[in-house]
Amino acid sequence: MQIIEGKLHLQGNEKVAILTSRFNHIITDRLQEGAIDCFKRHGGDENLLDIVLVPGAYELPFILERLLGSEKYDGVCVLGAIIRGGTPHFDYVSAEATKGIANAMLKYSMPVSFGVLTTDNVEQAIERAGSKAGNKGFEAMSTLIELLSLCQTLKG
């Protein structure tokens, strides 16, 4: 039996984008900082890293498709924060953003990591953006790095 898995190290020549929603920027800025930190710690070249900002989480799938379709990137780390409010808006935005991101990844068969927080309140989001529950931006970039490595291994 053979176990095939990705490694948590970049070769240094991977072109990566971090696609970040600006809405709830107090949270998403911290997620983005975590993702950048992870990228650099694991061998990424900052000159091969692009930060792409969109107004909100609903716009993430549209721009993700543009990035993947450009063929300029080896992978994309998607970050956002959708916080429940008093209306059903949260349900619509989180469902469509999640579905759109997954569909784009499958359509282009390219590594995409999902670092979009969906929380009930601001406190939960803060906990996941660098306090009690770690930094989910760092974790999303870590996932992308492993996916990039695994894809290289499977390519042979």
UniProtKB/Swiss-Prot annotation:
One of its GO terms (biological process) is riboflavin biosynthetic process. It comes from the Bacteria. 5-amino-6-(D-ribitylamino)uracil binds at F23, A57, Y58, E59, A81, I82, I83, F114. (2S)-2-hydroxy-3-oxobutyl phosphate binds at G86, T87, R128. Pathway: Cofactor biosynthesis; riboflavin biosynthesis; riboflavin from 2-hydroxy-3-oxobutyl phosphate and 5-amino-6-(D-ribitylamino)uracil: step 1/2. CDD domains: Lumazine_synthase-I. GO terms for cellular component: cytosol; riboflavin synthase complex. Pfam families: DMRL_synthase. The keyword Transferase applies. The active site is at H89. SUPFAM superfamilies: Lumazine synthase. Its EC number is 2.5.1.78. GO terms for molecular function: 6,7-dimethyl-8-ribityllumazine synthase activity. HAMAP family: Lumazine_synth (MF_00178). PANTHER family: 6,7-DIMETHYL-8-RIBITYLLUMAZINE SYNTHASE, 6,7-DIMETHYL-8-RIBITYLLUMAZINE SYNTHASE DMRL SYNTHASE LUMAZINE SYNTHASE. Catalyzes the formation of 6,7-dimethyl-8-ribityllumazine by condensation of 5-amino-6-(D-ribitylamino)uracil with 3,4-dihydroxy-2-butanone 4-phosphate. This is the penultimate step in the biosynthesis of riboflavin. This is 6,7-dimethyl-8-ribityllumazine synthase.
